[in-house]
Amino acid sequence: MFQDNPLLAQLKQQLHSQTPRAEGVVKATEKGFGFLEVDAQKSYFIPPPQMKKVMHGDRIIAVIHSEKERESAEPEELVEPFLTRFVGKVQGKNDRLAIVPDHPLLKDAIPCRAARGLNHEFKEGDWAVAEMRCHPLKGDRSFYAELTQYITFGDDHFVPWWVTLARHNLEKEAPDGVATEMLDEGLVREDLTALDFVTIDSASTEDMDDALFAKALPDDKLQLIVAIADPTAWIAEGSKLDKAAKIRAFTNYLPGFNIPMLPRELSDDLCSLRANEVRPVLACRMTLSADGTIEDNIEFFAATIESKAKLVYDQVSDWLENTGDWQPESEAIAEQVRLLAQICQRRGEWRHNHALVFKDRPDYRFILGEKGEVLDIVAEPRRIANRIVEEAMIAANICAARILRDKLGFGIYNVHMGFDPANADALAALLKTHGLHVDAEEVLTLDGFCKLRRELDAQPTGFLDSRIRRFQSFAEISTEPGPHFGLGLEAYATWTSPIRKYGDMINHRLLKAVIKGETATRPQDEITVQMAERRRLNRMAERDVGDWLYARFLKDKAGTDTRFAAEIVDISRGGMRVRLVDNGAIAFIPAPFLHAVRDELVCSQENGTVQIKGETVYKVTDVIDVTIAEVRMETRSIIARPVA
């Protein structure tokens, strides 16, 4: 009799609409219960039985129950699952399989089966890619996943690389394809094969994409020709190779090996500016005045060159610093190195006075054995030879940015707008508390930003600099010319790495159109979206492989008294993140390791400080001594402890 009763339906509807609900993200804990985090201030308790319906990271709508002053959440509807496609380790045998996601907060095995057509007999310990198929909040009985790809077996030494690439859905090898002959682009190539061009790279580099030639001019001026490898002489726009490069967007540099954007035959041979081999190039000729200013007679042209020497960073630096036993092979090469060092000096001073110069951070290099084991991690400081190449490339990119802006009005530009305008007042207020007075309007201009950066660089420590970093906007890739506040430049467009960056290949094609006096089509904005996304994924992959290798490298130091100098990079409620100075590893120091009495300890992310009994004991950028307390291989995390 109550079956289709409209009153009853109305009552149900009323009850439903009156029941309080909240949308938020599920946060799991080690203890079985969880929380529904609605925002930074508000969260609701989720009891263990209800946690079985959800997974850490799920965005859900939950019914809020109140009993005896205590509120709890009952998951009701799935808004967005945390897991869709993921990597994990297989448990069990072929008839009954489960997969444990490779994620620090997901410990439960999810029942699964292999997808149809996947011809691999899965066994315990295998790594696989899986996709979620069932979720309790979608009306399914339980969680269920389907294995869609076999990655590798559990004991494979190269697990860090294969699992990371699969996780981010990135290619594992070089693209297929060959380029048999150069295209007829209708370009006249200047013959510069007689000039003493040199390349300066790491000893192991095969994909040399830049060669340099310098010449002294009257009136204390210097001429610099930057010659860049010319892959677009082989790869036609819209061709199969071009499309593959467009998807990859960059060469992916991981510790130990790289996955090139172009086939190796092109990147490491046909396009690579090898010593004593004639190669086509796109070149830029510029004149530098005595104070390092780039004069207006910038010239882009196509050419052929023959590099006369493959020089190595450390050897060149040693020679310029009068150490080591390496000597340039001829006086002509020695003269090139001397002139290039002079150009570097002038350009460095010009940028210091008129733009911005980054503080030098060492690069960390993993030295790996045959089986992927980490033999050592070495800090490679940026020396004079690195700076020679860097200054030449920055100068060449400034030239390209100007030419593309003035002749076409578009290109692939690296744009960085400095501070987010919404943060300007908060930034000025923060700086004021530290005795620096800035105008909130002025700091949003390029000049105002540069002025502030120079003041910050003159501070005795980097503490204040670290505090304001959160107010900065991110660098972007844009087809529209715009300033790059981080470099202190009005415009910046890279074209000096076309073997490893697709955006540089696009700029090559645009520069060639300018050289030929032709009209060019503006690049589509979606290509900048693809490039930004690939850059993000490649960086995450590099970080993930690095974390794995750091954990392997430091595992035997856990629980020992070995001391490491460590810079504090971040402070949060739970403790401090530090970077080990000698090798670049990131470690976490939990708050209880800082002080035993929790009530006397204040870890403030906002202030970047740790206070004990009201006294500031640690702050971001401090360098302290730590020991390694524990290395958790399953989460690749390193736990450190300050040396008392």
Swiss-Prot record:
UniProt cross-references to PROSITE patterns, sorted A to Z: RIBONUCLEASE_II
Enzyme Commission number, as recorded: 3.1.13.1
Chief location: cytoplasm
Organism domain of life: Bacteria
Ranges where the S1 motif domain occurs: 561-643
Cellular compartment(s): Cytoplasm
GO biological process, one term: mRNA catabolic process
Any one cellular-component term (Gene Ontology): cytosol
Keyword RNA-binding part of the UniProt annotation: yes
Recorded catalytic activity of this chain's protein: Exonucleolytic cleavage in the 3'- to 5'-direction to yield nucleoside 5'-phosphates
Keyword line: Cytoplasm, Exonuclease, Hydrolase, Nuclease, RNA-binding
Domain RNB, chain residue ranges per copy: 189-516
GO MF entries: exoribonuclease II activity; RNA binding
Family matches, as Pfam families: OB_RNB, RNB, S1
Functional summary from the UniProt entry: Involved in mRNA degradation. Hydrolyzes single-stranded polyribonucleotides processively in the 3' to 5' direction.
Family: Belongs to the RNR ribonuclease family. RNase II subfamily.
PANTHER family found in the cross-reference section: EXORIBONUCLEASE 2 (PTHR23355:SF37), RIBONUCLEASE (PTHR23355)
Annotated protein name in UniProt: Exoribonuclease 2
Species name: Shigella dysenteriae serotype 1 (strain Sd197)
